Amino acid sequence: MNIAVTGGLGSGKSTASRLLAVAMSAEHLDTDQLCRQQMQPGNPGFAAFSQVFGSRFLSADGALNKQLLRQAVFTDSGVKNELERILHPLVREEVAEYYLHCCVTEKNLVVEIPLLFEVGWQHDFAVWVVVYVPEELCYSRVAARDGFTAEEIQRVCATQLPLSEKLKHAHYVIDNSGTFVSTVQQIAWLGKNLRAEISMGNARKTG
Ligand code: ADP
């Protein structure tokens, strides 16, 4: 079974998806991390990006200047769109290939995808889990984790579906507004439920 975990910025996707992978003895993929790997010199994302932008976002050593690119993504929708046009198909293919590997090794796969519904990849997955925390709590956790300003956080959130919309699509919701222990308990329940679904051979309808 392949399971997608999504949510808002800082809602706890990483925390919840890693716990769920442990609960199900599943493999885990983080699509943000796949994007970052694609943008390393020598990889296809970096090559395609360099063809479009030349050395505009490179440091003297030839590596990507992440700070410069991050600023451009915030302020220039042309750069953001082009980056997504390059990276999304590459990452989607990587996830599909890894799922094939999991099918062969008979493992489940948990994939963390911030923009699952926005990019329309939900039908690649059997189960859609949304991790929820109220907006104010997201903001304070992201500010503590990344040092982002409120304005930067708002700009990122403005490009995403509101969490309330994501919740409407969810097969399962994890409420991560409490303690880590509360989240662990919900994940333990979810893992058990999904394992039961698998053993009953449930074919979930994702349409
Ligand atoms: P996302 O992957 O959605 O951006 P993370 O899982 O990285 O979110 O969580 C954002 C921040 O909030 C991290 O610093 C994480 O350690 C913290 N965090 C996550 N869940 C909880 C929780 N239940 N209680 C307190 N802090 C949490």
For the regions a protein language model found, what residue spans apply to each?
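Small-molecule kinase domains that catalyze NTP-dependent phosphoryl transfer to phosphate-bearing small molecules
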Residues: 123-124, 144, 148-207
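Walker A/P-loop
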Residues: 14
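Hydrophobic anchor at the beta1->P-loop junction of P-loop NTPases
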Residues: 5
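ATP-dependent NMP and nucleoside kinases share a basic, alpha-helical "lid"
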Residues: 94-104, 108-144
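ATP-dependent small-molecule kinase phosphotransfer cores
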Residues: 36-107
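ATP-binding Walker
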Residues: 11
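Short beta-strand-centered segment that lines the nucleotide-binding/catalytic pocket of NTP-utilizing
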Residues: 26-39
